[in-house]
Amino acid sequence: MTPPRDHEGGRARRGPNARRRPEPARAKRERGTPRERATEAASLHLTDDVVRELRATARPGKGDILVKVFSESAGAFAEGDYGTAIRLGEQSKHMALRAATVRELLGLAYYRADRWQEAARELSAFRRISGSTEQNPVLADCYRAMEKPDRAVELCDEIDGRSVAPAVFYEGQIVAAGALADSGRMDEAIARLERLELRPEVAEQHHLRAWYVLGDLLERRGRFTQAREWFEAVAGADAELTDAPERVERLRSGR
């Protein structure tokens, strides 16, 4: 099914005591991935650029051990062993405090371990050192979990859609919409997503995520027909991706 036509113009939290809403299209802990690390140095699983950055920022005499320890941290992260990734990432940080890549991976490991304050600290350092907003959606989500929705929206507003991948920009808008909903600004949250390009010729994962979140917000706002149409669009694109088919049936039956 194609996305629904335009209609007239729903609070998700991720903190420890959150009343969780279904996540759109992929689990929350899959939000935020390190930049590409495939490499010619296959045994290290690091790009040549990353290796150069590590050696350039390492404390004197620590370049080789830093590359080894950080490589192991990245490997643990890839395997979902976030405790080990954090332990090795902290060791890496002490050897190269100004390495943006180290702070980025460590922040993402803390994020996936639901350790919001530590994640925000490290991802803020990554943002400051690198000048990149690539991880702002994840950083903003940390502030949502810490019940600071206004700061979350500010971080999402920093993301320039012309300078990041579309998926990053859309993710920022999704997080911002959730933060607005956290503050009870449901109509603003809906309007934020409705301003996106939601009717592409070919729908990518980030489009489906935006459709799902918009459907969720509309349902929570009591706009059930429009919500059902967006869930139908998600289900039509990939019936296995989310619980959209079940939500369609529930809305059809009025449950």
Roles of regions detected by a PLM:
Residues 82-83, 116, 149, 186, ...:
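TPR-repeat structural position
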Residues 129-133, 161-162, 191-198, 219-242, ...:
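TPR/TPR-like (Sel1-like) alpha-helical repeat modules
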Residues 29-32, 61-69, 95-103, 130-138, ...:
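Generic helix N-cap/helix-start motif at coil->alpha-helix transitions
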Residues 57-94, 98-105, 111:
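Alpha-helical segment of the N-proximal tetratricopeptide repeat
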